[in-house]
Amino acid sequence: MKDNIALIGFMGSGKTTVGKLLAKTMDMKFVDIDKVIEAHEKKSINDIFHEKGQIYFRDLEREIILQESLKNDCVIATGGGSILDNENIKRLKETSFIVFLNATIECLYLRLKDNTTRPILNDVEDKRKLIEELLEKRKFLYQISADYIIDINEHTNIYETVDKIKEIYIIS
């Protein structure tokens, strides 16, 4: 059994929400990569993107994932774009049981349509279209990176989701 559980998926798929509850029920530590980045930079993800750019952010994200994945007994919530870097997935595969929270486009849209903290979605007129386009580009990477895929929709029960992940992790 691997030491950690890493949650991957598109922004808004529930990685942080599921991760917090999963860590609590399994008596593990919870690590939100975006929050670690914000603490490191003393700035919001939005501000980092605007002031230093996406390349800087992705480099920092890689560094933080490498550092945090070396810890034991953690549930790690990754950023939605973390799978775009092969090094992130390579490291997570070495140390973590990877779960893809496969949320529907409708679910993602409902969760993200009024959100202003996601730099990629800011100043975008048709958020649903951008979500569809980005998810289409990323979905294969999420799928091939995952040890387990769990489907998420707007009616998914978080407790059932956590129970499924816990059960699969224990028997893995």
Swiss-Prot record:
UniProt-listed SUPFAM superfamilies: P-loop containing nucleoside triphosphate hydrolases
Keyword Cytoplasm: yes
E.C. number(s) listed in UniProt: 2.7.1.71
Highest taxon, organism lineage: Bacteria
GO cellular component, one term: cytosol
Cofactor(s) required for function per UniProt: Mg(2+)
Gene3D superfamilies: P-loop containing nucleotide triphosphate hydrolases
Keyword Amino-acid biosynthesis in annotation: yes
Stored PROSITE patterns: SHIKIMATE_KINASE
Cofactor note: Binds 1 Mg(2+) ion per subunit.
Compartment list: Cytoplasm
Any one biological process term the GO annotation gives: aromatic amino acid family biosynthetic process
Molecular function as annotated in GO: ATP binding; magnesium ion binding; shikimate kinase activity
Binding site for ATP: G12, S13, G14, K15, T16, T17, R118
Pathway per the UniProt entry: Metabolic intermediate biosynthesis; chorismate biosynthesis; chorismate from D-erythrose 4-phosphate and phosphoenolpyruvate: step 5/7
Cysteine-cysteine disulfides: none
The protein's role, per its UniProt record: Catalyzes the specific phosphorylation of the 3-hydroxyl group of shikimic acid using ATP as a cosubstrate.
Protein name: Shikimate kinase
Gene name of the encoded protein: aroK
